[in-house]
Curated annotation (Swiss-Prot):
Record: residues binding Cu cation: 47, 49, 64, 121
Cofactor note: Binds 1 copper ion per subunit. Binds 1 zinc ion per subunit.
N6-acetyllysine modifications at: 123, 137
Leader sequence segment: none
Record carries keyword Nucleus: yes
Organism (species): Mus musculus (Mouse)
EC number from the UniProt entry: 1.15.1.1
UniProt miscellaneous comment: A mouse model of ALS overexpressing human SOD1 variant 'Ala-94' exhibits disease onset at 89 days (males) and 99 days (females). There is a marked suppression of DAO expression and activity in the reticulospinal tract of the spinal cord, but not in the kidney or cerebellum; transgenic mice accumulate D-serine, but not D-alanine or D-aspartate, in their spinal cord. Simultaneous presence of the amyotrophic lateral sclerosis-associated human DAO variant 'Trp-188' potentiates the development of disease.
Identification of the protein by name: Superoxide dismutase [Cu-Zn]
Length: 154
């Protein structure tokens, strides 16, 4: 049975968006689609973070969702956090159209992303290849511009 989820991204500044998630069945890839506005032109890190806690803005969402205790990487890497979805790219108009298919995240089961926080970051994610310790944790993606809790949708 197909599962769907949605996340409304908001922050302290102009960045906002809505991301839809769909997974046709357990073990199938999750397809993300949506749009984020108010970004600066270029790439921005895009991750699922550990907690669905936004009580202190995006900072209370904790680190990247990483139940297997791996180092940070890109979405196609074997060595990556479950929440590592790479980058979204904004055009000159500040809009990023999101279209991602990922086989590591799931909308059900032990490591479901439901109830966790989606975050869009200030800078490009270096996919763990930045050559410093922070790269292996966060991809040097910088501050959290907007976030929202991933919830079950119809």
């Amino acid at each position: 049975m197909a599962m769907k989820a949605v996340c409304v991204l908001k922050g302290d500044g102009p960045v906002q968006g809505t991301i839809h998630f769909e997974q046709k069945a357990s073990g199938e890839p999750v397809v993300l689609s949506g749009q984020i506005t108010g970004l600066t032109e270029g790439q921005h890190g895009f991750h699922v973070h550990q907690y669905g806690d936004n009580t202190q803005g995006c900072t209370s969402a904790g680190p990247h969702f990483n139940p297997h205790s791996k180092k940070h990487g890109g979405p196609a890497d074997e060595e990556r956090h479950v929440g590592d979805l790479g980058n979204v790219t904004a055009g000159k108009d500040g809009v990023a159209n999101v279209s991602i298919e990922d086989r590591v995240i799931s909308l059900s089961g032990e490591h479901s992303i439901i109830g966790r926080t989606m975050v869009v970051h200030e800078k490009q994610d270096d996919l763990g290849k930045g050559g410093n310790e922070e790269s292996t944790k966060t991809g040097n993606a910088g501050s959290r511009l907007a976030c929202g809790v991933i919830g079950i949708a119809q």
